Structures are given as structure tokens and as C-alpha cells.
Amino acid sequence: MKNFLDKIFFKSNNLDNISNNIKELTSKTSVNKIFDVVNSYSSESEIRYVGGCIRKILNNEEVDDIDLATNLEPKQVCEALQKENINFYESGIDHGTITATIDKYKFEITTLREDISTDGRHAKVKLSKNWKEDASRRDFTINSIYSDREGNLFDPYNGKEDLKNGLVNFIGDVDKRIKEDYLRVLRYIRFFLNYSKHPHRLEVIRKLKINIKGVSRLSKERLLDELRKIIKINSLEKLAKDKICLELILMIFSEFKNFNIFLKLNSTQKDILKKIDFIFL
């Protein structure tokens, strides 16, 4: 959903004043229709913003993607959308996700879930009605924040405070979280470079290094997609200054050993190479 709504910006620097920002997001997007159809499905149906879009609103970043969580089951979501003639597709239904399309934009609507088992790449899940259970399966506290369209937060792991204080904390046991999905090694790097105001915790780094071999089990597509996000958000210059993050990257992508050459290029040359995906080959 690139350039979503010409990249909405939120001007306030006050993390306690997000209600208006979320209301603005709701009013300026087609997502309001989805809230309406889900909330009207039954007296007990609920739907909330979740994850990256809330994190970005809190941090005054541009919102380029909207994810939603609901206590409705996928088939019920389909029924609700169908009733109002909202287009959708079910390619992610095995994982509890229905993708609605309105005005050419996509909105992922995912049923609350609980992990049953995982092989380090994909989790087997069962559907849930429990918001805290759903939050507990997420990777970091800053990604486990939910909000209704009025801006009322559900934040069981104090992700808002962690974001405000520049803390990147795993939810629960670090080793378990990483083993559930080895991509979280790279996600830690991305979020640490972007949000942390503190040194790395040695115990976290130890767990990341212990589990880093598991990253090789992931698909090339998932790895490169996450690497692109790291570069896009943080730039190689920022990565170069963090020796621990750089060490982890080099353990995964040995091709990066000569990336200092890239740092010596001027901005125009860097932009050209990024456009042709040179640095991801």
C-alpha cells in the first residue's frame, strides 16, 4: 500500500494525544467502512487497529499500511464484508486473515489467534476470542498495541511506554520468541535501530546469536524483504555505527562484508543503486 493516502503524517509529539490522530486516520480512509460492517455483525463483535500502524502513529511516522484484528472468525468476516458488497480474498484464511479491498487499497483483517506449535518459520494457530492471548504471541511490546477507531488503546504489555522510552523488549521469554520465528532476529535489528535509545541488553544478544543459525531455514524472499525494510528505514550509515547489529547482519548476509564501499558513494549514486536493487543481490 505504497504512498498510502499520500503518506499521512501526524504532527503531534505528545504520545498521550493519539486519539485525534487515530480518528483522523479513520475519517480519511476507507477503513471506516470495515469498522462499521464488523461492529454491526453482532452485539459482541469487535475490531481494532493493531501492530505497525499504531506504533507509527505513536511515533509520528507516516502510516503506509493498516492491519486490523477482530474477534470474529474468518468466515464471519467474509459474511460481514459480503453483506456490504466489500471485495475481499481469502488467500490467508488458513492463518486467520481475510484481505479486504476498498478503493484499490488493501486491509488485512486477522482473527485473534493463539499459537499451537511452530517450526521456526510458520506457526500453527487456533482461533481465539481473547485479546491478551493474541497480544502474547506477538514479538515485541511495541507491536502489541491495539486501538479502536476512537483512539482507546488496549496495551497489555505496556508497549506505548516502551516506545516512549526507547525500549525494544521481546514479549515474554526471548529464546522462545526467537525460536517461534527466526525472522525475529532481523526484526530485532530493524526495530532496535529505529526505536532504541539504550544499549543492547547482553542477554538478548546472547539469545540472538545462539539462535542465528535458524535464520538459514527461512526463505530467501522473507529474508530479503526484511533486509530491505532495515535499509529503507535506517540507512546503511546507521547500521554501520551499531557494531552489534552489524555483526548480526554479517552473520546472516556474508555478502555485506564489503558494504563500506557503498558508504563512500554520494547520495545520487546510492539512490540509483537502491532503485535497481543492487545492494540486495
Predicted regions and their residues:
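Catalytic cores of the polymerase beta-like nucleotidyltransferase superfamily
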Residues: M1-L281
